[in-house]
Amino acid sequence: MNLHEYQGKQLFAEYGLPVSKGIAAETPAEAAAAADIIGGDKWVVKAQVHAGGRGKAGGVKLVSSKAEIEEFAKKWLGNNLITYQTDENGQPVSRILVESCTDIADELYLGAVVDRSTRRVIFMASTEGGVEIEKVAEETPEKILKAIIDPLTGAQPYQARELGFKLGLNPVQIKQFTQIFLGLAKMFVDKDLALLEINPLVITDEGNLHCLDAKVAIDGNAMYRQPALKEMHDPSQEDEREAHAAKWELNYVALDGNIGCMVNGAGLAMGTMDIVKLHGGQPANFLDVGGGATKERVVEAFKIILSDDNVKAVLINIFGGIVRCDLIAEGVIGAVEEVGVKVPVVVRLEGNNAELGAKVLADSGLNIIAAESLTDAAVQVVKAAEGK
């Protein structure tokens, strides 16, 4: 789950990190009034969406009057911001962050992520702040400094000092950097984060370090023990179908094809999409119904898949281990009848009671095509999607 910038900065402030004074406004009037509360004669206004590239898209602006703030808010509130990280429709803007202006002498990058290869939290820092870190990693990987955090000891001050020296910071700045580094490391563990970024972490004209941005993502598997963070969830920033799927504990990702896929198991789901592609088809989605593929979940999965008007056929690929294939077949039949599926449905069942499941499908009298193998299923569904 992602947080908005203003929410991330609220967390930063709780952990003693230096952030700008800011107010998230929901109306143009609130945005203009925020300038009086913040004070000063220059402000930065930022459209709040879960996407990078806002500056290039016009979603961030330096202003020097309340009239400019109000004009910016009127332009974006209620509208969609399109950046290189969004789809063609963009993401809706429901809040504008108004912040005090910070004079910048230099820009750095600081971030942390769970690294699967080392099975550790890894911090990354770079002198190339304010730009896309992916681009830096690709073109000049030597400019990215790393510190791997041992889960037994946690982040250590010496690691922060080592990064600070390599970033070219002076002694006072290294002390500030150490406090930021340790604060972020504690927050990462306390809040069950999957990723955090400060891009840029700036050096002000006075020579102090300041967190100018905040990107925070929480591990969705840990949301049950982070109720306060769960309240910060903004469903408007998610694909409507993906949000619906999450309510039913279905893993769904929308794609651009015309063949709907319903599979139990993430690995099998990816393999299914690969073989559909191999035989000339285009998957419309990734959908993992998991181990508990009950009739109710299959019904909801059908509803989600068929809410995409591009879907011309559906492939169901189930490996029966704990789940019996005959029960899955009954669930599929019930779902097809309840939802009123109008497109061809190809089903491949393998494993526990697979033959019985195939018989249940054959005896149903519905337009359900039982495949003999995964290859056969892919060939059949591609033909069905093409109307052959």
Swiss-Prot record:
It comes from the Bacteria. This is Succinate--CoA ligase [ADP-forming] subunit beta. The keyword Cell cycle does not apply. It comes from Saccharophagus degradans (strain 2-40 / ATCC 43961 / DSM 17024). It catalyses: succinate + ATP + CoA = succinyl-CoA + ADP + phosphate; GTP + succinate + CoA = succinyl-CoA + GDP + phosphate. Mg(2+) binds at N199, D213. Keywords: ATP-binding, Ligase, Magnesium, Metal-binding, Nucleotide-binding, Tricarboxylic acid cycle. Pfam families: ATP-grasp_2, Ligase_CoA. Succinyl-CoA synthetase functions in the citric acid cycle (TCA), coupling the hydrolysis of succinyl-CoA to the synthesis of either ATP or GTP and thus represents the only step of substrate-level phosphorylation in the TCA. The beta subunit provides nucleotide specificity of the enzyme and binds the substrate succinate, while the binding sites for coenzyme A and phosphate are found in the alpha subunit. Belongs to the succinate/malate CoA ligase beta subunit family. Transmembrane segments: none annotated. It is an enzyme of class 6 (ligase). The gene is sucC. HAMAP family: Succ_CoA_beta (MF_00558).
